[in-house]
Amino acid sequence: MDKEWIEVEILTSSEAAEAVTGILYNTGVKGVSIEDSKDIEEREQSEDNLFDWVELEELNVREGATIKAYYKDDENFEHYFQYIKDSVLNLDRFGLDKGEGKVTAKKVDEQDWANNWKKYYKPTKIGNEIVVKPTWEDYNKKDNEIVIELDPGMAFGTGTHETTRLCVKALEEYVNEDSVVFDIGTGSGILSIAAAKLNAKHVVGVDLDPVAVDAAKENVELNNLDNIEILYGNLMEVVDGKANIVVANILADIIKILAEDVKKFVVEGGYFISSGIILDRKDDVIEKLQQCGFEIEKINVDGEWCCIIARA
């Protein structure tokens, strides 16, 4: 197919990469790739370096994050493109460094992106036990490892961001075989899948974006899990009962808005694991959680981000 697709390239900071993918949730995006120099540097230095990095070094990845999103060349594109530009411009309102903040678009052949982006995704250890593996990659699992199969073709959180790692490590610590887990803003389903693979009794992932819901359902199927439900809608409207653990990897402002409602969905003595919180906003979120009746159990930090574990 000739020139049927449009590639939108967003040059931003590593810090804002997760938020930019969130912006893309609200558009008709068909594929996303994320090239983040920080991820590459961290993995090169990690003791859990899972593969040969020469291949990535040859890619000449720029400083910061380069996010490429792919759209059909149709009448809706100009609307989406303007929305993306405006949203990236306003990232600083959420306390995020947008970096260069440059947004450009060009037409590409389908084959230019359909497979090339896959070279940026490799098996990555994101917790003490959990490894996330793209479906097309081979990986020899170690005895104590739990492998999540993920197709990041829609790239709703691939596990490499600090906030995802923080949430996964918290789930590793708190999930047990009796746990019911609710995952707010499930995206790719990665946190729901992690909880299920950690032997949670039952997991419910919810998202307000139908594209994310479809992506999460596909990833659940890839992992052959029967203890997960993925639902479209608002937690308060689509979920019955209470959870031992509610996890949310979203922006600090959204956590503050949701905190009071989340309290109603956590059993007494249960936990609210929240991340997507830049360190500058930590105290704001803690204050709101305490106002809603949570006790702060623990705060974990990775880079410029934190994860707050609060007890109901």
From Swiss-Prot:
Q: What class of enzyme is it?
A: transferase
Return the Gene3D superfamilies for the record.
Answer: Vaccinia Virus protein VP39 (3.40.50.150)
Q: Which CDD domains match?
A: AdoMet_MTases
Disulfide pairs here are none
Principal location = cytoplasm
What is one Gene Ontology biological process annotated in the Swiss-Prot or TrEMBL record? methylation
Residues recorded as binding S-adenosyl-L-methionine, renumbered to this chain, are T164, G185, D207, N249
What molecular function terms (GO) are annotated for this protein? protein-lysine N-methyltransferase activity
Question: What keywords tag this UniProt record?
Answer: Cytoplasm, Methyltransferase, S-adenosyl-L-methionine, Transferase
Where in or outside the cell? Answer: Cytoplasm
Q: What is its EC number?
A: 2.1.1.-
Reaction(s) the record says it catalyses? L-lysyl-[protein] + 3 S-adenosyl-L-methionine = N(6),N(6),N(6)-trimethyl-L-lysyl-[protein] + 3 S-adenosyl-L-homocysteine + 3 H(+)
Question: Which InterPro entries does the entry mention?
Answer: Ribosomal_L11_MeTrfase_PrmA, Ribosomal_PrmA_MeTrfase, SAM-dependent_MTases_sf
This entry carries the following GO cellular component terms, namely:
cytoplasm
| Function in brief | Methylates ribosomal protein L11.
Which family does the record assign?
Belongs to the methyltransferase superfamily. PrmA family.
The protein's matches in PANTHER family, at most eight in alphabetical order, are given as:
ELECTRON TRANSFER FLAVOPROTEIN BETA SUBUNIT LYSINE METHYLTRANSFERASE
| Protein's name according to its UniProt entry | Ribosomal protein L11 methyltransferase
